[in-house]
Amino acid sequence: MSDRMRLIPFEKMLSWVLSELKEKDSIFGIHRSKFYKNKSGSYTELFGEKLATPLGPAAGPNSQLAQNIVAAYLTGCRFIELKTVQKLDGEDLPVSKPCIYAQDECYNVEWSTELRVPDAYNEYIKAWFMLHVLMKELGLSEKRDFMFNMSVGYDLEGIKSPKMDAYIEGMRNAANTDIWKECREVLLSNINQFTHFTREDLDMISPVVCPSITLSTLHGCPPQEIERIANYFLKEKKLHTFVKMNPTLLGEKFVRDTLDAMGYGYITLNGHHFIHDLQFPDAVAMLKRLKALARELNLEIGVKLTNTLPVKILNQELPGEEMYMSGRSLYALSISLASKLAKEFNGDLH
C-alpha cells in the first residue's frame, strides 16, 4: 500500500463513478442497496439548514480525499467535518509511518493534513460537487441535506497567514476559484450522461461551501489564544464556530477511573496534560463569553467533543514517545464531557 495520498482529477472521478454505477450498480464498492435515503421525513436543523442525519465521518485522513467523502455520504453521513488544515503542510510536515494503530482502541501520531492546503481545498470542492450530483442523480434527496464544516489550526498567527486566509475565504465562497470553475466545466461537458441531474441543478449549487468552522488547537494551548481565535472567526470571518475540546477537561482521576472500569488499565496517561490543558471552569467561562458574542453577531458557537487523548507509547505500537488515543475507549470520555457541559449550559450548547 502506498504511503502517499494520490489525488484523482475530477473528470476521472466522475467517469469512475458513472461507469461503476452502470456496470456494477455500486460506487467505490458500495452497492446501491446500501445508499442511504432519509425516508422518515425527520431532519436535524443546524445554522438554519436541514441535515438528513446528524452523523459524519471522523475528521482524519479518511476525510482528506474526495472519494472518501463521497463514500461517507452514500452510507448516511450528512455532517462532514473536513480534515484540519494548517500553515505547515505537505512535505514540510513529515509524518512517521506507520502513523495509525487500531488493533482495538485507536492511536495516531500524525498531525494535520498530509496534503498541501491548496490540494486539500481542491479535494473538498470536488467532493462538494460530487455530492450534489449524486444527491439528484440517485434520488437521495430533492434538496441539499448535508453540510460541510471546515477545520483549521493551530494558532492565530498561522490561521491569519495568506495561505490559510485564502483557504478560509475560498470555503466561504468558492465561486472564483480555479477548481470550482473546473468542476462546473466538467459537469457541463458531461451533462448528457446524467439521467436526473440537470443544468438547472448545476446552477443551483451554492459556492458557500462552509458556513461554519471548527477550531483545532494543540494540547496545552493557552485559553487566551483559543478565545482570540474564536473571536476572530466570529467577528472577522462571520462564521458559526465550533471549539474542539480536550478530554483532559474531565480531570485525570475521572479519566483514569473510567478507562480502568472499561478494561483499559494498560493505557498510561501523561499527567502533565491535565495540568497544562484548558481547565473546565475556564472553558465554561470562555464559552459563555463566546456565546454572548455570537448572539450579538447573529451567529452560533458550539463545541466539538472531543479531541484525542495523549498517552504514553510503552510497547512500540508507533514511533515516538507519545500517541493520541481515539476510538471506543475515547467515546465514553467524550459522552461524559458532553453530559457535563450540557448540564452546565442547561442543554443550550451545540
How should these model regions be labeled?
Residues 51-55, 76-78, 237-241, 297-301, ...:
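Short, well-ordered coil/turn segments that N-cap beta-strands
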Residues 123-144, 241, 253-257, 305, ...:
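Contiguous hydrophobic segments
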Residues 221-238, 242-255, 274-281:
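Extended, H/D-rich, highly charged conserved domains that either
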Residues 1-236:
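N-terminal capping/small domains of soluble enzymes
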Residues 61-63, 86, 245-251, 307-311:
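Active-site-proximal loop/turn and secondary-structure-junction residues that shape catalytic pockets
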Residues 31, 196, 219, 240, ...:
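Histidine (H) residue identity feature
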Residues 81, 242-244, 304:
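Conserved beta-strand positions in the central sheet of alpha/beta enzyme cores
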Residues 25-38, 251-348:
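Glycine/Thr-rich beta-alpha phosphate-binding loop at enzyme active sites
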